[in-house]
């Protein structure tokens, strides 16, 4: 017995599933919805019922046509008698008119008086009669033209989550009709409710059309697009190499680049040290080389951390008189970690104490062995100051680039990375980009990191306006809504609407990610964190001047136990607090305790930016008490006063039920709505309290800066006078040393 579902039988018979269910229920078949199955006998009965009804319908239609034909004949024969009756009626009407003419003459005067009223009444009557005529047309059964549905499409292209209203538009049907169908299927929805994949496909099957799912591409995933563009191997062409110059401070990196591009960067920079990242191009033997000039290795590392591996070759500059220095080793490690080939430029060979061989010996310890010694590292002895052997260095760079076989497709959409970015007062957001794939054009909609916009202007490395930039070309663009981060990737889109949607979505995700990040523990928030159950142990890094102090602190901390929460010593060592300690504390959410030691300037700066808590002590028991007290929630923060601004009262206004309003001018700093204030008259503090309100014109504001006027009221004080000085201050928390 071949069973068939109701919706399949309905499709075969060319009727709706509801109609089949209705017939099936008349025969007492056990059916519930369009998915119910029918056996062969049940199917035949339904088919028979449909065919019988079709015959009846045909018979009725035939009889109806007969009746219509007969009625038309009758109407024709009656037309003659109607004409005779009309002729008689004309004579009767003429007699009536002659008899009534006398009455009309007598009433003429009265008619003139009531003429005005009659006009208005006639208008009302005509309007009412017209409405009645319309209503009578419907009452008489005049046929209303039926609404014609557009034909169903062959395929319904849908996305998961579409609502009934969207589907109705796609298949040219009313939402009410679809809701009714879904109700018959046992699905209760309204027109704005999202539908899942199965429901949409069942609905399409019920209408007898195909369903095709359209998978939506996440336009905000620019990393995916970037990789697709990178992996596109069609129409590849040779591109210039991108070279980064690295090395120890004052070993001549910028001087070398200055000589290579024939400009004077060094003279214009403070102390001869590079102050920003730049990208420049040099032409040698009719070939172009792109150089990146970094202010330090941190920028290189940050770019790598963001996935921007933009460098093809690293030129390691080592001074022949100084040899290998700490930053030289750091540069080697960064280049090796990035998997970038290294060319060593031994600089300052013109100096009296220069010893290039000693440099080569030192670098062998770091697996950089010269080709002349049987290795594979290119060494070039140069003098950046006098321009000696620079052509040879460029030749070696081009040779290395040839070995790397660098290619890109300029015929696809532009993609690349941010070298640097800044906010310019006149231009707005300005970003230096390196095009890595495709071609970037002026006017292209673009997404850069979590920002978006349209390329408004584009300037090359020489400062000239250009219309397009091909692979390995550094450019400076304007037109972004915000300033991106160095190392961010960029990609262009076909239209600005898509670019905006992608940029806004990325910015939203970044904000959510930032909010969801773990707050670093400090002694001030330690008790609250423990109370919330977020922390089961307190991580501590101990640094002291001698080993004995380190061990004494470690042993004492281990003995602290507050409500089952213990102290975990993550790291302990002798010496100053350095960047590595801060990085470890940031990663492990720990507190740094220093005893008779201080943090290095860089470590202090990093701790402030990473929100890592450093506590410095000279007495051991105070350090122990501080940790224990913080864990018990009894540590009181210390505050100090900070003067933020001064306001001069130039006019006063008395307002009933409110008090005295002082019209002032901010002569220094700023005043905030939440600031504490002092009223100073002739150098004497008259009153100290808080602001009740702060306004600019009629608007309440949070802050008024120097050079602007404001209106203010002080809580519980109405004796403000012209000439008074209002001193604004805030209380800042002081870190415990």
Swiss-Prot record:
PROSITE patterns: G_TR_2, IF2. GO terms for cellular component: cytosol. Residues 60-70 have a biased composition (Basic and acidic residues). Residues 347-350 are annotated as: G4. Residues 238-407 form the tr-type G domain. Residues 55-152 are annotated as: Disordered. GO terms for molecular function: GTP binding; GTPase activity; translation initiation factor activity. Residues 383-385 are annotated as: G5. Belongs to the TRAFAC class translation factor GTPase superfamily. Classic translation factor GTPase family. IF-2 subfamily. One of the essential components for the initiation of protein synthesis. Protects formylmethionyl-tRNA from spontaneous hydrolysis and promotes its binding to the 30S ribosomal subunits. Also involved in the hydrolysis of GTP during the formation of the 70S ribosomal complex. This is Translation initiation factor IF-2. It comes from Ligilactobacillus salivarius (strain UCC118). The lineage of its organism: Bacteria, Bacillati, Bacillota, Bacilli, Lactobacillales.
